[in-house]
Amino acid sequence: MELKILEKSDDEMKMEIAGESHTLLNMLKIILLEDERVHTASYDMKHVTISEPVLFIKTENADPIDVVKAAVAKLITECEEFVTVFNKAVE
C-alpha cells in the first residue's frame, strides 16, 4: 500500500491509496460518513486493475487529516472487536 496526498486544503483532501480495493475504501468511507464533522466522503476507482483508488473528503470546521486519523482508529477498533467475537464464537 502506498498513500499520496493529491490535494489538501483546510476542509478538503484528495488522496490516492495505491494497492487497495473497494474493500478498504468502502469501509473507510462508511466510517467517515458517520462522523458529524464530515460533509462528504467518497472514493473513485476508474478501473480495478489499471487505476488506483482516490478518496475524497470534505469536512466542516475540521482538518481532514485529523478526521481520517480518527476514522482509521475507529476501523481498527471495529476489526479488533470482530476478531474477539469471532474467536469466542469458534471456540
Curated annotation (Swiss-Prot):
Family membership noted in the UniProt record: Belongs to the archaeal Rpo11/eukaryotic RPB11/RPC19 RNA polymerase subunit family.
Transferase in keyword set: yes
Record's protein name: DNA-directed RNA polymerase subunit Rpo11
Coiled-coil annotated residue ranges, if any: none
Matches recorded under InterPro entries: RBP11-like, RBP11-like_dimer, RNA_pol_Rpb11_13-16kDa_CS, Rpo11-like
Gene Ontology molecular function: DNA binding; DNA-directed RNA polymerase activity; protein dimerization activity
Transmembrane segments: none
Pfam families: RNA_pol_L_2
Catalyses which reaction(s): RNA(n) + a ribonucleoside 5'-triphosphate = RNA(n+1) + diphosphate
GO cellular component annotations of the record: cytoplasm; DNA-directed RNA polymerase complex
SUPFAM superfamilies in UniProt: RBP11-like subunits of RNA polymerase
Organism (species): Methanococcoides burtonii (strain DSM 6242 / NBRC 107633 / OCM 468 / ACE-M)
Gene name of the encoded protein: rpo11
Known role: DNA-dependent RNA polymerase (RNAP) catalyzes the transcription of DNA into RNA using the four ribonucleoside triphosphates as substrates.
Keyword Transferase in record: yes
Compartments, record wording: Cytoplasm
Subunit and partners: Part of the RNA polymerase complex.
Enzyme Commission designation: 2.7.7.6
Major place of residence: cytoplasm
Keywords noted in UniProt: Cytoplasm, DNA-directed RNA polymerase, Nucleotidyltransferase, Transcription, Transferase
Biological processes, Gene Ontology terms: DNA-templated transcription
